[in-house]
Amino acid sequence: MTIASTPLTTDRAELLARLAQPETYDLLIIGGGATGLGTAVDAVARGFKVCLLESHDFAKGTSSRATKLVHGGVRYLAQGNISLVREALHERTTLLNNAPHLAQPLPFVMPSYRLLDTPFYGAGLKMYDALAGKDGLGRTEFLSKDKTLRLLPTVRTDHLKGGVKYWDGQFDDARLALALARTAAAKGALLVNYCPAKELLHTDGKVSGVVCEDAETGTRYEVHAKCVVNATGPWVDLFRQQDAEMLGKPVKPMVAPSQGVHVVVDREFLPTDHALLVPKTADGRVLFAVPWLGKVILGTTDTPRHDLAREPEAFEQEIEFILKEAGNYLCRRPTRADVRSIWVGMRPLVKPQDDDGENTKKISREHT
């Protein structure tokens, strides 16, 4: 029996009826964030029969709690990770071309307060341009003090020497995730949210599906597949551990979770269409102040987090850190009372071998 489905149907009964059919999928994906949804689109576009299960809303976790940037990794360039920067720049181009309604170029300005800052950082950003090649969004430009102030009118003026302007991208993370979900559904994939995978199924010592549960009714379903993809982000080790226990094999954690806090303040702190880049914070990271929907996003942090909360909360010291670091570059320092919103994204960083995962700032952002 075949049940027709419109793209990303909201008819719960129809979705569950499809889920209950005795079907063996080519690919079963656990997790409806950017990775899971992207995998679903790729697989179904190649003709595979795909089912995706999500325990909450699509893009509930990290995939809707980003800094809203499509960047090639300026910080990674400073670390000498050229291959990662080149890959990120390629992906930036792909996203800008594929979703121009959700992703656009964004100019950034890095103010300089020491005489050598402009040539030092400018040279690095020129290399950024070179790595982007024909896919560059605009040329890096060395700025005078006056032009820096025209582009960033609220930046701190004392000891300001000039600045550097470069280009990267900005996107709507949550809308992109939903666009991926709709695309996958339109091509025939079955996507069901609020239906968490509860346990893995095994056949001949290999994972062959999951038992999932409708969060509304508690009804359980067995879903079988030739291949199961664990795309649960920071929670990936929970299923890996379950699989290991079932097979009686030890397994080491793969992920070192890290949280990134974002603070939103009013646009008056940065009344411009240019983003501000703080090249080096007290903990050695970069910090962004990014215009977004009439407000300004300040962030982010990199703090190890092991409790894997579904609704991670910012530590007060993280909020104060962001406000202080941003305030060092603004003529008016934002205070705790100026904060309009806060969100936290969890990074599923791949833990290096023989590493306790406590210094997440140094963990590579490359995939394994």
What are these regions (language model features)?
Residues V44-R65:
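Glycine-rich FAD pyrophosphate-binding loop
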Residues R175, T183, A244-T368:
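C-terminal catalytic lobe of FAD-dependent flavoproteins
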Residues S112-K187, V192, L200-K206, L293, ...:
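Flavin (FAD/FMN) cofactor-binding and adjacent substrate-gating region
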Residues I29-I30, V223-G233:
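Short hydrophobic core segments
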Residues K68-L151, L287:
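Dinucleotide-binding Rossmann-like beta1-alpha1 core, especially the glycine-rich loop
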Residues M1-L27, D42-R46:
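Extreme N-terminal leader/targeting segments of oxidoreductases
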Residues N230-L247:
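Flavin (primarily FAD) binding-site architecture
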Residues E23-Y25, E216-C227:
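Core beta-strand elements of the Rossmann-like FAD/NAD(P) dinucleotide-binding domain
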